[in-house]
Amino acid sequence: MGSGKVFLFSPSLLWSQTRGVRLIFLLLTLHLGNCIDKADDEDDEDLTMNKTWVLAPKIHEGDITQILNSLLQGYDNKLRPDIGVRPTVIETDVYVNSIGPVDPINMEYTIDIIFAQTWFDSRLKFNSTMKVLMLNSNMVGKIWIPDTFFRNSRKSDAHWITTPNRLLRIWSDGRVLYTLRLTINAECYLQLHNFPMDEHSCPLEFSSYGYPKNEIEYKWKKPSVEVADPKYWRLYQFAFVGLRNSTEISHTISGDYIIMTIFFDLSRRMGYFTIQTYIPCILTVVLSWVSFWINKDAVPARTSLGITTVLTMTTLSTIARKSLPKVSYVTAMDLFVSVCFIFVFAALMEYGTLHYFTSNNKGKTTRDRKLKSKTSVSPGLHAGSTLIPMNNISMPQGEDDYGYQCLEGKDCATFFCCFEDCRTGSWREGRIHIRIAKIDSYSRIFFPTAFALFNLVYWVGYLYL
């Protein structure tokens, strides 16, 4: 049944029906045997390949172990590369995963980064067909690592789940790459003079802790820092504008250190504060003007409205301050809220002034009427005497009386004549006459105009200047 067998048959066999069937069966059996032999050969080849694939890692693993043992033999991880010869150059790179949130109360922000450092260590050179050794974090403690620390960090956490998020690569020429993932709470001193229209540059500073610049030199591996998609960052009140990196030297008692800094430029979004503070303050001021259209004799209505608006402004001022640290200077929001409070308080004082002077005038009119009624009947008239109407006789009144009446207005008497009697006489000279009854009419024009001018100057000054 092998493939080398030869079958001889005569034409007479073809005419025999029985022998013809046997011949066909024989040919089919021969073909099936050839297929089985080929399948066995292919299985043998696959088995050989599988055996090679299984054995290859064992040989490779042994080579790596041998390389690592030879590199670490006599290696002192307490000494930096090229010590006593030249400074060790550290190339740094940062990939920003996310920024936020920013805490204005504690003046700090949170940032999640992948921090990479690259340097050359001639003690780690090796000769092998492998160009790079890809190692895990277990090898980190066995070689020299730069003592880089973040200078403005308040709290830093390395990620350990599910394993330490650290990476180590060693090239055959001695180049070492070390990366790790960090979450840092860094200081960011906010200047809140223009709050909530402020912009800030939050720094992230790092340098060597113990090696001055003549021992370690830091350099940026790339001219710019890479960042992830900012739309997933938890900045909330802030918008990410951009970033920039810089290098500077810090002069200290222990030496001169190279400081690497990344500045994250942020601008505050005004939407929250517009809804929570600015619009309520404006509406409260406008509401206080309603009292100018209420009858001046409606004392309870105008008084309650004025007091309510003043208390509302006090509450808004307190709420606006809760989202800020207790700074000693005036912010833009403080200025706006304070001016709104002044307008509301002035509206209340306007009615107090109006009510005071109108009440005095009513009392004076009542006294005059009583006096006239008493003098209208004279008990000592003789028969035949002529009766002269008293209303045609002007009562003697000196200029001191005018002065006394004007002085009742206290400071008002210095520049204004606050009573109708001040229209004439020497007290009228050099003074502006104000009709008390029309103070509400004046206020309806003055208060809205003054508030509109203030808003114009305020918003143009803080947004465009």
Curated annotation (Swiss-Prot):
Role summary = Gamma subunit of the heteropentameric ligand-gated chloride channel gated by gamma-aminobutyric acid (GABA), a major inhibitory neurotransmitter in the brain. GABA-gated chloride channels, also named GABA(A) receptors (GABAAR), consist of five subunits arranged around a central pore and contain GABA active binding site(s) located at the alpha and beta subunit interface(s). When activated by GABA, GABAARs selectively allow the flow of chloride anions across the cell membrane down their electrochemical gradient.
Identify this protein by name: Gamma-aminobutyric acid receptor subunit gamma-1
Superkingdom of the organism of origin: Eukaryota
Cite the ranges annotated as topological domain Extracellular.
21-273, 321-328
Regarding tissue, the record states: Expressed in brain.
Q: Where are the transmembrane segments?
A: 274-294, 301-320, 329-349, 445-465
> Any idea which GO molecular function terms this record carries?
GABA receptor binding; GABA-A receptor activity; GABA-gated chloride ion channel activity
Which Cys-Cys disulfides exist here? 188-202
Lineage of source species: Eukaryota, Metazoa, Chordata, Craniata, Vertebrata
One GO cellular component, as annotated: receptor complex
Gene symbol here is Gabrg1
Pfam families registered for this protein in UniProt? Neur_chan_LBD, Neur_chan_memb
Q: Which GO terms describe its biological process?
A: chemical synaptic transmission; chloride transmembrane transport; gamma-aminobutyric acid signaling pathway; inhibitory synapse assembly; synaptic transmission, GABAergic
How is the protein modified post-translationally, according to the record? May be palmitoylated.
Family of the protein in this entry = Belongs to the ligand-gated ion channel (TC 1.A.9) family. Gamma-aminobutyric acid receptor (TC 1.A.9.5) subfamily. GABRG1 sub-subfamily.
**Membrane topology for this entry?**
Multi-pass membrane protein
Catalysed transformations (reactions): chloride(in) = chloride(out)
The free-text domain note is: GABAARs subunits share a common topological structure: a peptide sequence made up of a long extracellular N-terminal, four transmembrane domains, intracellular or cytoplasmic domain located between the third and the fourth transmembrane domains.
Q: Pull the Cytoplasmic topological domain ranges from the record.
A: 295-300, 350-444
Q: Which residues are glycosylated?
A: 50, 127, 245
Assembly and oligomerization: Heteropentamer, formed by a combination of alpha (GABRA1-6), beta (GABRB1-3), gamma (GABRG1-3), delta (GABRD), epsilon (GABRE), rho (GABRR1-3), pi (GABRP) and theta (GABRQ) chains, each subunit exhibiting distinct physiological and pharmacological properties.
Where found in the cell?
A: Postsynaptic cell membrane; Cell membrane
- Per UniProt, which keywords does this protein have? Cell membrane, Chloride, Chloride channel, Disulfide bond, Glycoprotein, Ion channel, Ion transport, Lipoprotein, Membrane, Palmitate, Postsynaptic cell membrane, Signal, Synapse, Transmembrane, Transmembrane helix, Transport
Signal peptide: which range, if any?
Answer: 1-20
